[in-house]
């Protein structure tokens, strides 16, 4: 009996653990794991198929092959459990121990572990302070290393070749010093390291040295040594003396039919190691010559290398078929490795997949499940039911019953399935709406039926898509599926909070057609008492669907929200001017929505807005019912409408011929000009492309105008225009299918096509699809079509990879508390670009929590208290009282250490309420950004030539009426004519309304003439400033007499004659074309005052010096009198090269990877005055002198455009050299908020271009993760190393600890890491290893003896626990609390026991202690 109980005890062993530690194994540890030494390379006997004794599959070492049966068969069955057979030495136990028992190989010579040698940076090299090359020479027996110099002048760890060694032996005599070859030598060196002492010396040297390179090197070495010291791992364990052998079941040998065997590559690799090891042992016993032994040792080292990581060094070992063998390292890394294949993505039971078809009769929370599939999926449930009902006595009988599919089985299936949700998933699962739960409805047939409204969320269509079904088994799982995942509970997109259950295509068309109005329809102007009357008239063909009529309509207003049911609403009857269709549709309107929401043509956007309004006003349940009704009506009405397309619907505009012939004439004109040499080929090409582009647009416009309207006679007999009922136009206008651009190809002209390389072919396709294309036109258009397909394939892969990196960097970010109590936040304004409001303030702050009280600017009363979550009504209020800037909480400034707080995150967009604790907001953010990735383009845009010329603006005008305000950065001077000339680089003009709310803002460039002044009231359309778009001026900020310096004709400047006017100007020559003597000098101007002294910059003793850059046209003469604001020189900007603008997906990836752009802008490091120093070869030297008089130098390439000139005052972070911004500079000079704003805006630009809406906070969450590491500047009294990068939370914890002890905390600066880098440098080595660069991550972690606290989601998935998010967060918290309570209780009990032994009260003991 006891044995039986023991047997059960074996099974349930649930280990609780809170962390996982990784380290290096000592030889003793490896021997302690082992169940015996593997001495022979044999595997199994080819005749008996039994494993060879002491071989790689030995039953004595690894355990029996059959359960409870020894190898020779002497002991069989359970009763002998634990007996070791005296004949064959096998323990009688379960065969599955062969999966967990390890063996070992005692190596005859130590070998180095290749990971610590070759995984860069080489850890062995770091510890020994030797180069990788030298260590390799020693290990592979090409050189000796001095281990013990003795009394000789040799140094420890000195490398010498064999000849050297022999020479030194002769010189100093044998045995005076010890030098070894191979891993023995390295092992001795490692054993000889005194870590404590080394650390002290390095720390001392770190203090002493000033060189950057040295500090870096020392810090790296210090980190490794300290890790060894902390973790208690000895460095010489990096050299293996014992090799562990994997349990045989994990490297199986399977007999195939025909007497052959399939084997794991590891067996081959182990065999080679054992063979070479045995040969080496024999050679050592035989005292073979040194050279032979050496060779054998080298081969052993190589064999061990390829077992651990084949192909890392030298050529990979290959098997019989010339294929490289798969080593231990390859088993765990990559997509097919252990991590990604088996731990993160497992195949699951209780699942099936089938094709999907549309199920228009289903309710939103249902799906149609084929009977056969359901029978298979719910089999165990049916067996159980059959047994409890007594229909079948055993499982076997139940199985038979089910397989014969008797009627009773179907009844039971119905019963089992009722209220048991199933989960449907469509690959690729790009966001959380890719898996939703439904209640199954049994259907005939073999295809799953899917509700049409969830197609948008799944991105599914019915052209052969397949979906998988999963059954949640446990009660908890069913409950979660029902409450959290049911389709009717997921009606909003988590990415932007818009409804996901929007109808599309037919439904939209049906609803649109129903709600359109028609002039002079049958029965126009009739008045009806109620809707039933309208329906009667319509069914008797007295009125048309689109006729304008008057109807009495009952609306329900929400009067008391507290009551339940219909008591909340009060009916209100009004006479409405509407159409028949809208009146009929109003029957389905939920109570609480006014009729006005339906009283307009319902296009797709309108329907989305309608569902959104319903959700906010009427709640989830009503919305779902309403959406279902809309769907039914839409389908019915679309069928009744009978809209179809005929060739006559494609109306070709009569003006087309004229437009095309005019364009062709213009092109001819340009060809002529080119022939006569007036324009270059490039210019001609640009203009031709321009002309055809414009012509295409004109044809398109003419076509749309014709399609849009039609002439009808109204009931007074007048001819009027009304919106057209053309089928194609209706489809496009309603948003059901097609777009203006596609209609243009049908009935306008196809226009310009691109070659595969992206350049535009200059001959357009003038035909459209209605007229048909000729062969050439067809051929030209195939390019584009094919490129589109290739692009899509690439895009999908790239987008998937971006999502993977994003998920990886944010996976451990979970909402863990309600409020972190921070008073930080970010000030939100409306997003204005080019004078237009792109995103209103209300949209940006919706669903955020305000930091400070929002004050009404007119009455100064508090309108909204701090800490309030802004919902739709509150943003309305903010809008109406005229607040234009609100400070809101953001994930960026959240003070929660490991995770986020709910207040900083704000509204959970997928649910419409404040986010719940445990929500995995990181993953949601990553999915929201990654999911639309496939819609982004892959191309980079060439902007240049004609296209960019048209876009050059030369003035800016106000779009709104209001008051002009200049920003603090705006500086200007007034010239002799009284004009105000701008001399700032980053000045902006704002226009505010009467409330002082910003309506628009415009950048005003340097050198512009201001036409308005600060505080002036203006009307819309007033010009604010003008400038010359083609040149950039250099303007004098002081007045005086010009004195040229280094302006010598033929040396630094050249005379240029203008052919047309005959005037001459001086042009500064490029340094490359100057004589060698004049290379370094720079043409410049000084100003003299009336007494002939140099004019000084006020407040300093610097002379005003204005330098001219290469290409500048000098417009003043020597000795000329100039006034403030006068132009001294002009720099033509026309020479701008066409530049590629990275767009689409690559741009998003570039931003999140925090890559520094090439030719990045240079920002001023300090606030101060600029001047130019002496130029070096090819570089200009720019000096900024700060307010304390310290000079900061910048070297800038000559061809770069410097935006500042001598004597200009710049602010820290201001751009001084043109170019794209570098995010690292922004962070360093302007801080976290500026950086976040930059990244958010740039990413949003890309998505906005594609019409994708993503909430800002998702991008902020990613940026938070990119900023989660900091770099230590001053260590204070902490354990860190200068220059070390650590997790922000770890640093803050350590600082808190140090401050509590009254010591000095460490100071740090923020670090911006790209998402890949950030994922790899997380504290969790499990998460990092499963992401990328597995070898490097594990090597580093093992040396550090790292502990993974299993904080993130990924680590927990890998070790197979519940994730600490959602319901799992509560579980883990409860578990930890229980453990703590248990510990306390155990301690208390122990104390009581101790007290009772001494018969003294416990209190007294404590007192004594």
Curated annotation (Swiss-Prot):
Cite the InterPro entries for this sequence: DNA-dir_RpoC_beta_prime, DNA-dir_RpoC_beta_prime_bact, RNA_pol_asu, RNA_pol_N, RNA_pol_Rpb1_1, RNA_pol_Rpb1_3, RNA_pol_Rpb1_3_sf, RNA_pol_Rpb1_4
| Cofactor binding description | Binds 1 Mg(2+) ion per subunit. Binds 2 Zn(2+) ions per subunit.
For this record, the Gene Ontology CC terms, alphabetical, are: DNA-directed RNA polymerase complex
In which domain of life is the source organism classified? Bacteria
Spell out the SUPFAM superfamilies in the cross-references: beta and beta-prime subunits of DNA dependent RNA-polymerase
Binding of Mg(2+) occurs at 461, 463, 465
Q: Which top class of enzyme applies to this chain? A: transferase
Reaction catalyzed: RNA(n) + a ribonucleoside 5'-triphosphate = RNA(n+1) + diphosphate
EC numbers for this chain: 2.7.7.6
Q: Which Pfam families match?
A: RNA_pol_Rpb1_1 (PF04997), RNA_pol_Rpb1_2 (PF00623), RNA_pol_Rpb1_3 (PF04983), RNA_pol_Rpb1_4 (PF05000), RNA_pol_Rpb1_5 (PF04998)
Q: Where does Zn(2+) 1 bind?
A: 70, 72, 85, 88
| Binding of Zn(2+) 2, residues | 820, 894, 901, 904
The protein's UniProt keywords, in alphabetical order, are: DNA-directed RNA polymerase, Magnesium, Metal-binding, Nucleotidyltransferase, Transcription, Transferase, Zinc
Could you cite one Gene Ontology molecular function of this protein?
DNA binding
Any one GO biological process: DNA-templated transcription
Name its co-factor(s). Mg(2+); Zn(2+)
Checking HAMAP family in the record gives: RNApol_bact_RpoC (MF_01322)
PANTHER family to which the protein is assigned, alphabetical: DNA-DIRECTED RNA POLYMERASE, DNA-DIRECTED RNA POLYMERASE SUBUNIT BETA
Question: How does the record describe its quaternary structure?
Answer: The RNAP catalytic core consists of 2 alpha, 1 beta, 1 beta' and 1 omega subunit. When a sigma factor is associated with the core the holoenzyme is formed, which can initiate transcription.
- Task of the protein: DNA-dependent RNA polymerase catalyzes the transcription of DNA into RNA using the four ribonucleoside triphosphates as substrates.
UniProt similarity note: Belongs to the RNA polymerase beta' chain family.
Q: What is this protein called?
A: DNA-directed RNA polymerase subunit beta'
